[in-house]
Amino acid sequence: MSPPGGDATVGSDEKRQKGKATPDTIKMGCIAMVMKEGQLRRAEILSIKDTKSGRQFYCNFDNFNKRLDEWVPAARIDFEQDVEWPNPDKDKQKDAKTKKNNSTVSKKQPSKKNNQKKASKREQSVASDGQTPHPWTEFVESQPGKNNRQRGKTEDGTDVNASLEVGGDKGVKRKADEIDMDEDEIPAAKKQRQPSFSREQEIEKLRTSGSMTQNPTEISRIRNISKVEFGRYVLFPWYFSPYPQIFDQEDCIYICEFCLSYYGELKSFVRHRQKCTLHHPPGNEIYRDDYVSFFEIDGRRQRTWCRNLCLLSKMFLDHKTLYYDVDPFLFYVMTTRDDRGCHIIGYFSKEKESTDGYNVACILTLPQYQRKGYGRLLIQFSYELSKIEGKLGSPEKPLSDLGLLSYRQYWSENIIDILLGYNERKEACTIENIAVALAMTTQDVEHTLQALKMQVYHKGEHKIVVPEKLIKQREKSKAKQKRLIDPERIQWKPPVFTALNRTWGW
């Protein structure tokens, strides 16, 4: 499989055996012709599962983005054509390697005494929640407790993250040791050793190239949910999300658009909707205009709701790998209103106290609202809050591929507007002036200027030049721009937290 955000090329250049197959004999690693968008396309079978509607096959289509992988029924596979079978020699090598890895892991098993200590700590954490047991609790308790307590460090010590995704949110989309699927659910793929980077090199790489997760297991993880019914919309997830394993067998899961509770049975979901009394996110409304509202939710006060929001967003963010510890975060949820209530459009989260100066930890616009200008509103709102705080902010890296594009567009448009204003007044402008005016970090300003090739060195001085082409592009985008955040409507003061409110909830 290709990394997130890239186009997948199915199979390798090696010759494969071809032959007939049936729904019962086809296996993982086979390449077959699968119907997609009315055409037969070459696809690799990465996983197989039995659902209530029958056997389904997880297909990675040739030259298609990873997020377009999907579960398909046997009826969409053309079994009249020969399929390409995986190389048997490689299967033997893989089996031998798997056995070797299993034996190595067994030697490094922690002592029974340590396991008991970890289990008791997890029990105390659940008890301190002060809420009824949740299906997610059982799933978390089955995972290694130590790994989940690590605060956003990769193996090379790098702080990262969505996630959308985007993203991938320390404790919400951070690259800590993630909750993995069983080994037999990981597809047969080459796992190359990832190059090691220093902290500065890694941040620079992620800043300029978008969301490319550095964890090979995360890349090869199979999407487990096929379809989601969310309010009036049917959503098709892009990535794996760690809902309880029992939901893997469902053809569709049902999520309440107000409280975000999830159900596998339609009857249970209908019963819940009749009893659910929530009609807006469980927080304070801090902004309202004719189009949207913003709610501020404290992750410590609304743990279950925020955890459910993280599970929902993980389906559309490739790098969001830690979902349980929401206590140190504030969630800002954007909604649209009608007579039924407030419907979630998207959200961003931020740390209650960020040592790195991040004003966004995770940001996502739900797929049904993308390409409508809502992502820009989320970004603008995050910077308006930074202006009220009197700080310079920056989103936590890495951004998802779509998040990176949205931020670059927002940065470039606002920087051009600032520069044109200085030019009209015939005033000198520096990078620091731009950063303060937009509440951006000087590093983000400088990277944007370099990406747009607006920094030049002339007669011994560094100068900022705005090409005529960019000015015309900005004028066109202004004509299309419909919605903006009105800073006068924001009813918000920077919250003050005690040390207890800022800590993790273990």
UniProtKB/Swiss-Prot annotation:
Acetyl-CoA binds at residues 361-365, 370-376, 400. Belongs to the MYST (SAS/MOZ) family. Its EC number is 2.3.1.48, 2.3.1.-. Gene3D superfamilies: 2.30.30.140, 3.40.630.30, N-acetyl transferase-like, Winged helix-like DNA-binding domain superfamily/Winged helix DNA-binding domain. The record marks 362 as: Important for catalytic activity. GO terms for cellular component: chromatin; NuA4 histone acetyltransferase complex; nucleosome; nucleus; piccolo histone acetyltransferase complex. It comes from the Eukaryota. Pfam families: MOZ_SAS (PF01853), Tudor-knot (PF11717), zf-MYST (PF17772). It is found in: Nucleus; Chromosome. Component of the NuA4 histone acetyltransferase complex. This is Histone acetyltransferase esa-1. The keyword Zinc-finger applies. The ESA1-RPD3 motif is common to ESA1 and RPD3 and is required for ESA1 histone acetyl-transferase (HAT) activity and RPD3 histone deacetylase (HDAC) activity. It catalyses: L-lysyl-[histone] + acetyl-CoA = N(6)-acetyl-L-lysyl-[histone] + CoA + H(+); L-lysyl-[protein] + acetyl-CoA = N(6)-acetyl-L-lysyl-[protein] + CoA + H(+); 2-hydroxyisobutanoyl-CoA + L-lysyl-[protein] = N(6)-(2-hydroxyisobutanoyl)-L-lysyl-[protein] + CoA + H(+); (2E)-butenoyl-CoA + L-lysyl-[protein] = N(6)-(2E)-butenoyl-L-lysyl-[protein] + CoA + H(+). Catalytic component of the NuA4 histone acetyltransferase (HAT) complex which is involved in epigenetic transcriptional activation of selected genes principally by acetylation of nucleosomal histones H4, H3, H2B, H2A and H2A variant H2A.Z. Acetylates histone H4 to form H4K5ac, H4K8ac, H4K12ac and H4K16ac, histone H3 to form H3K14ac, and histone H2A to form H2AK4ac and H2AK7ac. The NuA4 complex is involved in the DNA damage response and is required for chromosome segregation. The NuA4 complex plays a direct role in repair of DNA double-strand breaks (DSBs) through homologous recombination. Residues 1-24, 82-215 are annotated as: Disordered. It comes from Neurospora crassa (strain ATCC 24698 / 74-OR23-1A / CBS 708.71 / DSM 1257 / FGSC 987). The active site is at 396 (proton donor/acceptor). The modification N6-acetyllysine is found at residue 320.
